[in-house]
Design a protein with these regions (language model features):
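Solvent-exposed, acidic/polar segments of extracytosolic/periplasmic ligand-binding ectodomains
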Residues: 318-381
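Periplasmic-binding protein-like
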Residues: 61-73, 92-94, 136-139, 189-206, ...
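Extracytoplasmic ligand/sensor domains, especially the bilobed periplasmic-binding protein
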Residues: 67-161, 220, 230-236
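Short beta-strand elements in bilobed, periplasmic/extracellular small-molecule ligand-binding domains
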Residues: 31-47, 108-109, 157-178, 193
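Short beta-strand segments enriched in small/hydrophobic residues
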Residues: 1-20, 29-33, 133-139
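Beta-alpha junction/loop-to-helix N-cap segments that form part of ligand/metal-binding clefts
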Residues: 20-21, 31, 35-99
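Extracellular/periplasmic periplasmic-binding protein-like sensory domains
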Residues: 210-283, 296-297
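Short, charged, surface-exposed loops that flank catalytic or proteolytic processing sites
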Residues: 294-309
Length: 381
């Protein structure tokens, strides 16, 4: 039997984040009948490094887990990685991938299994620049504090786009007021592209206020993955969008492959609910954990041997082929271009299979070697 430790976060933006992620893991492990014990603990927003380290120490030293799943992307994760290195135990980092890699990566015992948001935002910026050359950037004080904002806007400008206006909202719905943005768009009708990054209730509020404007029908919204969250209408209320909204995402329920159909069937069977992004991420994580269990005779749960054994392995993920980039120990999957209709239902209109090329562009961009921003994991605030 494999013993899995999972340190899970809290999120006010996405209250069910940890729950959905855990249910996705459990749904896959149960479906595949993987003999595994899952031990969980909660680390809040992950902004207290001592607390997170203490929970990791308990799992690695006292409970002696074979693999530690850690939902976090703070720089302080390095302290846990150092502990795991001394024990030669694998840390499987999971998060949205909204930040650029740290300068201590790659780490010899860390595998980063993210949703690759910086890759998708970079691709969306390029896509937007190919259609419209003048844009307004729309984000919140919170969402704009992560690298995915730079990935979206910089790639737009690098491909000939001009940013004519920046709208940065407060991060509470009660204080959300997009009137300055609407006034700008009415006075500058040549600006029809909106590079937009919001999540949760702010995403819904942004779309709801925008759809009520007379100018809305002339606009095109190029969205971050969390703004294209399919669950927004069900959670926060119906939308009737008169404008086109599109962008690259890590996953959408309409992906037509066998692995995604299996995810949707088994998640519904296990939970009684439709599959969602966090649930898919948990399912995907368990896919990797199953491989680690099945190859245990070769590596005996030694982290460095596990990582060496992943070289050249392709997983059949609901997202498409999932592989490790050996140079950085980051898992990479295709990016899906979607266009949403008036009620935010999504249609896949394109895909980029070779996201390793975009990932390498990010790594090669020397202007982003040092980045500032929020210390907590994206969505975990």
């Amino acid at each position: 039997m494999m013993k899995i430790g999972a340190l899970l976060p809290r999120s006010t933006f996405q209250p069910l984040l940890h729950h959905n992620f855990q249910q996705g893991m459990q749904a896959y492990l149960q479906y595949r009948q993987v003999p595994a014990e899952l031990i969980t603990a909660h680390i809040g927003f992950g902004t207290e490094p001592e607390k997170v380290l203490a929970e990791a120490e308990k799992m690695l030293l006292e409970q002696q887990v074979d693999v530690l799943v850690l939902y976090a992307d703070q720089d302080a994760v390095q302290n846990i990685a150092s502990l795991a290195r001394s024990l030669n135990r694998l840390v499987l980092l999971v998060h949205n991938g909204a930040k650029y890699p740290y300068n201590w990566e790659p780490h010899p015992v860390v595998l980063s299994h993210t949703l690759n948001n910086t890759i998708q935002c970079r691709l969306t910026g390029q896509y937007a620049a190919g259609l419209l050359k003048d844009a307004a950037v729309c984000t919140s004080f919170y969402d704009g504090g992560y690298s995915h904002c730079h990935a979206l806007t910089q790639s737009y400008m690098d491909n000939g786009g001009n940013i004519a206006y920046n709208f940065v909202s407060q991060y509470k719905v009660q204080e959300f007021n997009s009137t300055p943005l609407h006034d700008f768009l009415k006075a500058n009708t040549h600006v029809q592209a909106l590079l937009s990054l919001f999540n949760g209730d702010l995403a819904h509020c942004f779309l709801q206020q925008l759809q009520q404007q007379d100018i809305a029908k002339d606009l095109q919204v190029f969205a971050s993955p969390m703004l294209l969250d399919e669950t927004l209408p069900a959670v926060y209320g119906e939308l009737r969008l008169p404008f086109r909204i599109s962008g690259y995402v890590p996953w959408t329920s309409s992906i037509d492959n066998n692995a995604n159909r299996l995810l949707k069937t088994q998640f519904l069977h296990s939970t009684g609910r439709e599959a969602n992004l966090a649930g898919m991420h948990g399912w995907d994580t368990a896919l990797i954990l199953e491989h680690i269990f099945n190859t245990a005779d070769q590596h005996r749960f030694r982290a460095k041997d596990i990582l060496a054994g992943l070289d050249g392995i392709t997983f059949d993920s609901p997202r498409g082929p999932l592989r490790m980039d050996t140079a950085t120990h980051h898992m990479l999957a295709p990016a899906w271009l979607v266009q949403a209709n008036e009620v935010l239902e999504q249609e896949v209109t394109g895909r980029v299979d070779d996201t390793a090329k975009t990932w390498q562009e990010i790594l090669n961009d020397k202007t982003i070697a040092t980045a500032t921003g929020w210390i907590n994991t994206y969505l975990c605030a």
